[in-house]
């Protein structure tokens, strides 16, 4: 079935599934992790995630080249079944209290999660959400804009070059995520996330310097560093700010929703600027928004507190 309504429906289902995947994996990982092991495991998860994305993209390109685009759908179906089989192997003995970030220092007490409205008083968490929303408002449109510029300059190579950008960036994300697992507990979360955020305005500025095909693809590789760090650090920071509240899952989902809104607005904003002022102005505007994201993150304190297990939301 190839009707617009059917495609829209299936894509909506895919959007729902992808939006809950990362928070669910983070919660399961937390519920299965020993104390102090969450950082390494979440970084490992992200590394495997990016490796899987890269391999899937390569396989999709090869299959599409030899058997046409329809082969990609069979590949995705096979991978989905393999994912289900892997999910069935996840141990069932998940500590549900730990998975939701609920601490109980008194074993005799029955811990209860804090009211959801109390999370709105968690100013660092709100500031983190705003920072992430600005980051994705600036970031989401950059690859589409680069793809459009590549298509204008090299119509015959636009699709292969865009695919190369995506695959190469995914490979860069692997060591970036692994670095989070190694350094997040030593250096703190904020310095690493600042590195990821600071790369974004740099990318926006670098895109304006040249329309050369090799230059655009090379600059896009920087996206792998920022995205690799972001995906691994965000769950750690949310856990830091909500530990003991029992609302880790809700908070991570809320932050994900907020930055998803930023990402959804990004392409429309960039397209409007391109229409009225051109690509250079669009990249500069996105770089400016990325700068605001960096400024907001600078206002956030370091979230990691060694050997601390707060029972109420962190305060500014």
Segments (PLM) and residue ranges:
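Cytoplasmic helix-loop-helix junction between adjacent transmembrane helices
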Residues: 10-51
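Pair of pore-lining "gating" transmembrane helices in MFS-fold secondary transporters
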Residues: 122-141, 221
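Juxtamembrane intracellular "pre-TM" segments in multi-pass secondary transporters
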Residues: 93-128, 315-316
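Structural signature of the two symmetry-related core transmembrane helices
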Residues: 191-206
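Hydrophobic core of transmembrane alpha-helices in multi-pass small-molecule transporters
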Residues: 6-20, 215-229
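Short amphipathic helix-loop junctions that connect adjacent transmembrane helices
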Residues: 144-160
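Helix-to-loop junctions at the C-terminal end of transmembrane segments
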Residues: 64, 176-188, 274
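Symmetry-related core transmembrane helices of the 12-TM Major Facilitator Superfamily/SLC fold
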Residues: 72-88, 283-298
């Amino acid at each position: 079935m190839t009707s617009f309504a059917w495609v829209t429906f299936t894509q909506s289902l895919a959007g729902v599934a992808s939006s809950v995947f990362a928070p669910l994996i983070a919660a399961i990982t937390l519920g299965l992790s020993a104390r102090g092991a969450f950082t390494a495991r979440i970084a490992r998860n992200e590394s495997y995630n990016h490796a899987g994305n890269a391999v899937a993209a390569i396989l999709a390109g090869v299959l599409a080249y030899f058997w046409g685009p329809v082969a990609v759908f069979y590949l995705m179906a096979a991978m989905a079944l393999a994912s289900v089989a892997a999910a069935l192997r996840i141990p069932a003995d998940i500590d549900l209290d730990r998975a939701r970030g609920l601490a109980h220092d008194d074993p005799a007490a029955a811990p209860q999660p804090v009211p959801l409205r109390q999370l709105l008083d968690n100013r660092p968490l709100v500031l983190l959400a705003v920072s992430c929303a600005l980051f994705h408002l600036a970031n989401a449109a950059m690859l589409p804009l680069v793809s459009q510029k590549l298509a204008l300059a090299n119509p015959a190579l636009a699709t292969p070059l865009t695919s190369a950008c995506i695959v190469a960036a995914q490979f860069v994300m692997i060591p970036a995520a692994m670095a989070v697992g190694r350094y997040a507990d030593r250096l703190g979360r904020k310095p690493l996330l600042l590195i990821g955020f600071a790369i974004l305005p740099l990318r926006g500025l670098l895109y304006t310097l040249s329309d050369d095909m090799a230059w655009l693809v090379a600059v896009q590789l920087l996206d792998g560093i920022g995205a690799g760090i972001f995906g691994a650090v965000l769950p750690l920071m949310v856990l830091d700010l909500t530990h003991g509240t029992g609302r880790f899952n809700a908070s991570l989902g809320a932050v994900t929703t907020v930055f998803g809104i930023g990402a959804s607005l990004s392409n429309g904003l960039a397209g409007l600027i391109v229409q009225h002022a051109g690509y250079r102005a669009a990249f500069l505007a996105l770089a400016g928004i990325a700068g605001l994201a960096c400024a907001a993150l600078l206002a956030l304190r370091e979230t990691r507190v060694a050997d601390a297990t707060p029972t109420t939301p962190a305060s500014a």
